[in-house]
Amino acid sequence: MASVARSSALLKQVAAQQSVAANGLRVAAFHTTSRKSLLPPPPQRIEGTVNDPVEVPPPSPSHGSYHWTFDRVVAAGLIPLTVAPFAAGSLNPTMDAVLAATILIHSHTGFGNIIVDYVPSKRVPKARKVFTWGLNAATVLVGLALYEFETTDVGLTETIKRVWKA
């Protein structure tokens, strides 16, 4: 009895190995495509000796947990600001302006975090500066556009309401 069970288990194991080998070749063929890097490799330089400690940057309240907390508070504040005008039924221009400003701040800090994370200042300092200035210019431009839209047109929440019913 044990020999029959053992031979059937061995047959299952051999079948599984053959299946893995056949599928493995297809997966390996799929994953062996060439990979292109977006940035050239960084220069190989060593500052100091191996026994020197790593420089710790000075603490700043605009980085770390303070920055993360501010982002989360703004994101959480968008929830009631988005729902309140439609739930209450009143279109208050002050609340509309606060909603537009909060969306603008949330977008600016979010895109700023993307730039900080994916455009390293040590590796590409000029590109980092260009992206940061571009973000600042876009934020000012969108802020002016939202101000103009709020003061001379129907406003953000009324526009959303009209588009929703269209």
Curated annotation (Swiss-Prot):
At the top level of its lineage, which domain of life is listed? Eukaryota
User: Which GO MF term does the entry hold, naming one?
Assistant: metal ion binding
Keywords, in A-Z order = Electron transport, Heme, Iron, Membrane, Metal-binding, Mitochondrion, Mitochondrion inner membrane, Transit peptide, Transmembrane, Transmembrane helix, Transport, Tricarboxylic acid cycle
Note the topology in the membrane.
Multi-pass membrane protein
Membership in a protein family: Belongs to the CybS family.
> What GO cellular-component annotations does this UniProt entry give?
mitochondrial inner membrane; respiratory chain complex II (succinate dehydrogenase)
Task: Indicate which residues the UniProt annotation says bind heme.
Answer: H106
Its pathway is: Carbohydrate metabolism; tricarboxylic acid cycle
Purpose of the protein: Membrane-anchoring subunit of succinate dehydrogenase (SDH) that is involved in complex II of the mitochondrial electron transport chain and is responsible for transferring electrons from succinate to ubiquinone (coenzyme Q).
UniProt cross-references to SUPFAM superfamilies, sorted A to Z: Fumarate reductase respiratory complex transmembrane subunits
Principal location class: mitochondrion
**Chain residues that bind a ubiquinone:** Y118
Location comes to: Mitochondrion inner membrane
| CDD domains noted in UniProt | SQR_TypeC_CybS
Q: Which Gene3D superfamilies match?
A: Fumarate reductase/succinate dehydrogenase, transmembrane subunit
* Sequence ranges on the Mitochondrial intermembrane membrane side: 88-94, 150-166
Protein name per its UniProtKB record? Succinate dehydrogenase [ubiquinone] cytochrome b small subunit, mitochondrial
Mitochondrial matrix side of membrane: 1-65, 116-124
Transmembrane ranges, per UniProt, are 66-87, 95-115, 125-149
Subunit organization: Forms part of complex II containing four subunits: a flavoprotein (FP), an iron-sulfur protein (IP) and a cytochrome b composed of a large and a small subunit.
Stored InterPro entries: CybS (IPR007992), SQR/QFR_C/D (IPR034804)
Its GO biological process annotations read: mitochondrial electron transport, succinate to ubiquinone; tricarboxylic acid cycle
